[in-house]
């Protein structure tokens, strides 16, 4: 699988890259201050099969070209957003992002999750790493909530457009079954005929 990862200037970015490489993916990293046409041209040229939005500081609307890229990518190729990327997915699709009830930085918490969803295949118990003060406060139309912690959305998916958001950090050692989660995410996101959609 060919992945393009949009780097939102986060220290966890290359942890994600390493995990994807261990799963056999080819990963190219592009920063969010890269001009949008440059990223679009690269995605079209190399047959990218998944766009990944990294974690990062601040708010999604301040993260370079990320929201514009999402508007272009929607319906064209699958997207996986992690932490800030998860929030950007929601905002770009018409959802809302607000303050978390309690900021969490470097904390491991348990999740309540939908065990029927392929993201959680083979996972019975799950504790995840959380580094955030913002959450998705309103789910966008077309998205399903897959997991929550104390009523706050921790994972969501748009099955029609193959967009998946994780508020937590699967690449962190504080997350149990992190590599399995990423493998399941790749399998779920990779089910589209991506190249045909990119040409549309």
UniProtKB/Swiss-Prot annotation:
Matching CDD domains: GATase1_Anthranilate_Synthase (cd01743)
Protein name according to UniProt: Anthranilate synthase component 2, pyocyanine specific
The species this protein was found in: Pseudomonas aeruginosa (strain ATCC 15692 / DSM 22644 / CIP 104116 / JCM 14847 / LMG 12228 / 1C / PRS 101 / PAO1)
Protein's pathway: Secondary metabolite biosynthesis; pyocyanine biosynthesis
Complex formation: Heterotetramer consisting of two non-identical subunits: a beta subunit (PhnB) and a large alpha subunit (PhnA).
Protein keywords: Glutamine amidotransferase, Lyase, Virulence
Taxonomic lineage: Bacteria, Pseudomonadati, Pseudomonadota, Gammaproteobacteria, Pseudomonadales
Gene name linked to the record: phnB
Leading EC class: lyase
Disulfide-linked positions: none
Reaction catalyzed: chorismate + L-glutamine = anthranilate + pyruvate + L-glutamate + H(+)
UniProt-listed Enzyme Commission number(s): 4.1.3.27
Stored InterPro entries: Anth_synth/Amidotransfase, Class_I_gatase-like, GATASE, TrpG/PapA_dom
UniProt-listed PANTHER family: BIFUNCTIONAL PROTEIN TRPGD, MULTIFUNCTIONAL TRYPTOPHAN BIOSYNTHESIS PROTEIN-RELATED
Superkingdom: Bacteria
Other known facts: PhnAB is not feedback inhibited by tryptophan.
Observed phenotype of the null mutant: Single disruption in strain PA04290 results in decreased pyocyanine synthesis. Double phnA-phnB deletions are tryptophan prototrophs; they make less PQS.
Keyword Lyase: yes
Active site: 83 (nucleophile), 169 (for gatase activity), 171 (for gatase activity)
GO MF term (any one): anthranilate phosphoribosyltransferase activity
Job description of the protein: Part of a heterotetrameric complex that catalyzes the two-step biosynthesis of anthranilate, a precursor for Pseudomonas quinolone signal (2-heptyl-3-hydroxy-4-quinolone; PQS) production which is required to induce the genes for the biosynthesis of the virulence factor pyocyanine (PCN), a characteristic blue-green phenazine pigment produced by P.aeruginosa.
NCBIfam families the record matches: trpG_papA
Glutamine amidotransferase type-1 domain sequence ranges: 2-195
PROSITE patterns: GATASE_TYPE_1
Residues involved in L-glutamine binding: 56-58, 87, 133-134
């Amino acid at each position: 699988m060919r992945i393009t990862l949009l780097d939102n200037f986060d220290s966890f970015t290359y942890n994600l890259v390493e995990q994807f490489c261990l799963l056999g993916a080819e990963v190219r990293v592009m920063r969010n201050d890269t001009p949008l046409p440059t990223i679009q041209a690269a995605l079209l040229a190399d047959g990218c099969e998944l766009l990944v939005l990294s974690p990062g500081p601040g708010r999604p609307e301040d993260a370079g070209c990320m929201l514009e890229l999402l508007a272009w990518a929607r319906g064209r190729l699958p997207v996986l957003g992690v932490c800030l990327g998860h929030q950007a997915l929601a905002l770009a699709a018409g959802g809302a992002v607000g303050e978390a009830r309690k900021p969490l930085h470097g904390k491991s918490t348990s999740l309540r999750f939908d065990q029927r969803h392929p993201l959680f295949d083979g996972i019975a118990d799950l504790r995840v790493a959380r580094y955030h003060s913002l959450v998705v406060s309103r789910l966008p139309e077309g998205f399903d909530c897959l997991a929550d912690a104390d009523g706050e959305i921790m994972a969501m998916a748009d099955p029609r457009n193959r967009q998946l958001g994780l508020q937590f950090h699967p690449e962190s050692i504080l997350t149990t079954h992190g590599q399995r989660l990423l493998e399941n995410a790749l399998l779920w996101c990779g089910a589209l005929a991506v190249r045909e959609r990119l040409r549309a």
